[in-house]
């Protein structure tokens, strides 16, 4: 079988979801939430319903929570079933098997071989990310896949390297983590039905919210660590900023979108939008500080963001 396709999509004509439009503060959030936004969108489902998890992100010492949509909520909202794939044989063989059965595969991948990362990682540096395999054409050595903010294709050498085609067996090579995404029992619910399911999900995640203000704690850690972070240079800074500021800002933007989608928590949504835009200002301000070696004074900005976090949480709590 030359071609195995679980979801036929024309990459050239694909239009990403509005959450990935250029008008967003954070066009790309993190690799896992991004693929789910686009997979659900491609399945003609509304990803705004599954974003309640973002209310619970916390500052965890050296990073903010790398937030992901809970698999149980994907099942309850949409009838999409996610399970770990036991990668006991080459990934290409699994892809042929499962895509032919109409099952998508999410898998870790090396961004060095992903052409959609042109200008950043592609053919420049080896970076772990997550993609979703959708359309495999073995005869043409071509793959259609979801990654970051859209749907793309790769082929030829990128295909060979992604799937290790022709590589000798290497007992030291550990298989990449992968999951199957089954949607044969997809549930196409109305907006009202999704709202009824999503409300208790937000309440459950709210119960897991940080016990103290995570933006305040992050500001304290930033001030303590900044001399070392600044001295480590831009490469270190970019990795640190992705793990911290970007996750905070992207989660806040998605939470604001979810709350606006609900239609009854606009005050809270505005507060989290303030955190999102503040995070973008901070990430740029901090980059300039690293580049110029000048001091970073972010106390006022972080104070505004911390106050916005408290306002937002208070508003959600009052409505619950």
Language model segments and positions:
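A structured, charge-rich N-terminal accessory region that forms the first stable segment of a protein
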Residues: 2-89
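Active-site nucleophilic cysteine motif
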Residues: 24-40, 65-69, 191-192, 204-222, ...
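Short coil-to-beta-strand transition motifs
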Residues: 123-131
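Charged, long alpha-helical assembly modules
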Residues: 246, 252-320
């Amino acid at each position: 079988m030359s071609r195995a396709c679980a979801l036929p999509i024309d990459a050239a004509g694909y239009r990403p979801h509005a959450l990935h439009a250029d008008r967003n503060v954070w066009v790309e959030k993190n690799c896992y939430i991004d693929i789910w936004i686009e997979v659900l969108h491609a399945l003609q489902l509304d990803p705004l319903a599954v974003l309640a998890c973002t209310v619970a992100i916390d500052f965890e010492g050296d990073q903010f929570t790398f937030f992901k949509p809970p698999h149980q909520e994907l099942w309850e909202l949409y009838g999409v079933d996610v399970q770990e794939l036991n990668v006991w044989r080459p990934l290409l063989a699994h892809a042929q098997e499962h895509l032919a059965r109409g099952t998508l595969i999410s898998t870790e991948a090396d961004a060095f071989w992903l052409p959609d990362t042109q200008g950043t990682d592609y053919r420049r540096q080896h970076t772990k990310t997550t993609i979703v395999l959708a359309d495999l054409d073995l005869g043409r050595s071509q793959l259609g896949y979801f990654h970051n903010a859209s749907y793309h294709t790769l082929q030829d050498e990128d295909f060979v390297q992604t799937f290790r085609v022709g590589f000798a067996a290497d007992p030291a090579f550990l298989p990449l983590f992968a999951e199957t995404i089954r949607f044969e029992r997809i549930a196409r619910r109305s907006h009202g039905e999704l709202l009824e399911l999503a409300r208790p999900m937000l309440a459950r995640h709210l119960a897991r919210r940080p016990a103290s203000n995570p933006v305040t704690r992050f500001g304290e850690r930033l001030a303590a660590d900044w001399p070392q972070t600044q001295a480590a240079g831009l490469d270190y800074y970019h990795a640190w900023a992705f793990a911290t500021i970007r996750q905070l800002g992207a989660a806040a933007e998605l939470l604001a979108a979810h709350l606006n989608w609900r239609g009854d928590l606009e005050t809270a949504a505005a507060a989290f939008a303030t955190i999102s835009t503040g995070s973008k200002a901070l990430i740029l301000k901090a980059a300039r500080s690293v580049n110029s070696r000048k001091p970073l004074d972010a106390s006022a900005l972080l104070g505004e963001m911390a106050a916005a976090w408290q306002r937002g949480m208070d508003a959600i709590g009052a409505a619950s």
